Amino acid sequence: MWHFCEQVYECFEGYHRDYSVQTVPVEYLASHYIVNKFRPDPLAVLWLFCLGIWWEIIQILHHLFQYKEPALFVGSCQNLAAFLEKKYSMEVIQKEGLAASALKDKERLTEKAVVNQPLSNLIPHSNKMYERSKSLLSGLKRGLIKQKEIAFDKLMGGSTIDFQHIPTGTLTPGENKVLDIPIVPQHLLTSTNITDYHQANKKNANGATALHVGAIEVIMDCFTSPDSNICGGMLLVDTAHLNPDNAIRSVFVAPFIGGRPIRVLLFPDTLVEIAPNMNSRFKLLCTTSNGDVAPDFNLAMVKVNVAGCAVSLTRTYTPTAYLEQELIKEKGAIVQYLNRHTFSMHRNNQMTKEEMQKQRLSFRLESALTLQEKHPLHATFCKSTNFVYKIGGDAKEGSNGNLTVNESQLSSHSPSAHVLHKHNNSGDNEVEFSEIGVVVPGAGRTKAYGQNELDLAQLSLDDTSSLRGTALQTKLATSRIILSKTMVGNTVLREDLLATFLQDSNERAAIDLIRTHVIRGKIRCVASINVPENTGCALAICFNSGITGAADTDIYTTSSQDAIVWNPACEKAVELTFNPNPCGDAWNFVFLQQTKAHFAVQCVTGWTTTPLTDLALVLTWHIDRSLCVPKTLTISSAHASFPINRWMGKLSFPQGPARVLKRMPLAIGGGAGTKDAILMNMPNAVISLHRYFRGDFVFEITKMSSPYIKATIAFFIAFGDITEEMTNLESFPHKLVQFAEIQGRTTITFTQSEFLTAWSTQVLSTVNPQKDGCPHLYALLHDSATSTIEGNFVIGVKLLDIRNYRAYGHNPGFEGARLLGISGQSTMVQQLGTYNPIWMVRTPLESTAQQNFASFTADLMESTISGDSTGNWNITVYPSPIANLLKVAAWKKGTIRFQLICRGAAVKQSDWAASARIDLINNLSNKALPARSWYITKPRGGDIEFDLEIAGPNNGFEMANSSWAFQTTWYLEIAIDNPKQFTLFELNACLMEDFEVAGNTLNPPILLS
């Protein structure tokens, strides 16, 4: 029977713990006993059955007496709902009106004869977290007898504690509000007589000396409106540590709004020494996003629930599997109620194996002082022997982390020797160990030295880590550029290989730059110049991955990769941080030299007013702390953000009240330039591959004239050929841009809501803008341009990126598509199998019977063709999107499908006597072996189709004809027998889905065929 009572008590206690109510249904006891216990007592089961019958009778009487109108209690809640639905239907209300008792009936229907339960605590009970004795006596003592509050000096080890609703204080809005998280009620702590560990004896050896804090629940009852926008952040700080990496335990973010309280559950798993200051061990740092609370009101009331277990010298806590495998791993959580978004993060600063190998541990054992005679009239106290044991590598940063041991010689190791001591002159008997390991034999004064006192392997001479440190320690070079007082726009101030900018230097990190193999930090270029505000100009610093031939350095091409355009009259200093290897996460100096990475400093717009003297622009180069991140573009994949860096143009507005309107096309796949040649960059070439596109356009507006010249510009999207004479232009959705005194730049965004459909990337230049159906970006002088000095109001417009980029179809391209400068996680849909023409070659017709052979070589990446001296070759190179991309993309990776069509003259099949051999090679050396060969002997020609996989050493990317890693390119060598019959060769190309590009190469203008 005692065993049965103990089981009933455990059921009673478990239900009270799980459901937080004061009464326990007998059905729960019976079901729990019958299901969970395999050998029930029949008498006990009969007793529970009778008790259950009485319980049902009591519940029925409770329901009957609760309702004042017994007629409403019709069998069940379903009948009640049906009754009310029939009584208060919409038709009845429209005819008879709403009864006065409708709200009461609705309240009864909502309650359904069940009283709402209060909001319960979420902290687990201590008996769920700690194992404890399950004897009947201890169970009755814990549950049936109300436990009194015990002072901590009488608390025994192994005892569990549960403190509810410990008051903490109130929280006021603002930053850095600190609250102590009490672990025990303060009145218990102050009445405790704390004893020291060393004073423990047999009588009080089981007395609690520490408290293991298993769980803390912080409850915040907010006094704010439930619909307010106040958001709060909380840091749980352990003040036993000084290092923030160890002190900050958890971070919580939640809305501080009224309604249900904020409940933060913490599982510190921390042993706290019982001491007068133990309640100040944990602190909660709170801050709010705004202080929208009146001064006379508090933000919230805070209270704490704690569960833990006492620890003594002889007894410790035993965690349950729930605590060890679930709660400790979870570390903490914050309750997320409906329509509340919360966030929690937990810090982990545990030492890794590599960090442990870098630690230095030193052990020093000093002997007692002994009186030693110096001379007959003088004696002093000295240490006869000392022991020093050191573990760890070099304390300096960058050590290899190997463990080393240095041990002094002990007198006990060699009876005839003693450790050599060097006493300093101060007489404080401190021993210097500069000659540890030097042994003096007792019979003489001969010195003996060990042979391997220094381990060369520990010097870390093979350290390959990247450059790091402060800006001074990582300073690579300084460049000084003179700006003439007569400087005009479109002037290149200095351009050169990036390696040339960096190598001529005596700065601290110059040698490290040249001798380091792998550098993972970005390059940071800081440009500074002082320009008076009554003048102004526009300067640009630009980085590109490569340069070919007599490349054009127009701002359209140079600013397409990594660049910044600024007005030094508004911004005295700017910085450009970039990754010189867009395909990888590291680089080095030789890489910059052999890939021909290019850097340019140029003037976009000249002086507004002429300065009295020349000026100096200073560039300082550093290794930035931010790591290099690859930046590549996949042709067939969607891009959440497409970094286009498209220079849209320079807009000039004369001073005065006259209306001035500028137009910039958004069909941006046609490049820039004139009618006979175009300029192209890599991002624009990628755009031109697609037939149609749309997205969110982000423009950067830069002021290029003096800050003293003022104007307000309205930007809007419109179709057709709009002129200044048209009225109501600002009826379009528009954005007004008005620069402050020292503001040099701003950004504006036009989302997809401005555009009904997508539009073409390229438009024929012969099509009137009124009929092209493509949007344009217009800039209208809103009020007037005016100043106290002469000069126009000049701004530069640059399309930074296209967000939520969507593209449709593949574009074969146009010759002479509309160019720049006409003025007064999205889905990619691509049509595969669409080819772009690359080039067409017609053989020379001057061949004779004696010279019946011709050959030519074509570079597949650069689209350059060279023929032999047989005669005049007719060569046509098409500026198609794929051909342009292969030229301007510095790094390429993936598969290209080529189609070579060989056409013959119209001769009889019996008269056909021509053939062609085609070799695919990657080097023009006569020792290079072909990768593939074809022979065509069919009458009147034929065609071949082949896939070419571009794969290189830089994370799979290849740079054509680069000295770095001896990278070559791909050629077609075509030898023709009887070129009078084989007359025409055409090459088409199609990019496959895995094709990727990175970086921009500066090229000469591309001639239109």
From Swiss-Prot:
One of its GO terms (cellular component) is T=3 icosahedral viral capsid. Keywords: Capsid protein, DNA-binding, GTP-binding, Host cell junction, Host-virus interaction, Inhibition of host innate immune response by virus, Nucleotide-binding, RNA-binding, Suppressor of RNA silencing, T=3 icosahedral capsid protein, Transport, Viral immunoevasion, Viral movement protein, Virion. Residues 387-393 are annotated as: Involved in tubule formation by the movement protein. GO terms for molecular function: DNA binding; GTP binding; RNA binding; structural molecule activity. The keyword GTP-binding applies. GO terms for biological process: symbiont-mediated suppression of host innate immune response; transport of virus in host, cell to cell. Pfam families: Como_LCP (PF02247), Como_SCP (PF02248). SUPFAM superfamilies: Positive stranded ssRNA viruses. The keyword ATP-binding does not apply. The record marks 451-452, 825-826 as: Cleavage. The record marks 468 as: Interaction with the viral RNA. InterPro entries: Como_LCP, RNA2_polyprotein, Viral_coat. Gene3D superfamilies: 2.60.120.20. This is RNA2 polyprotein.
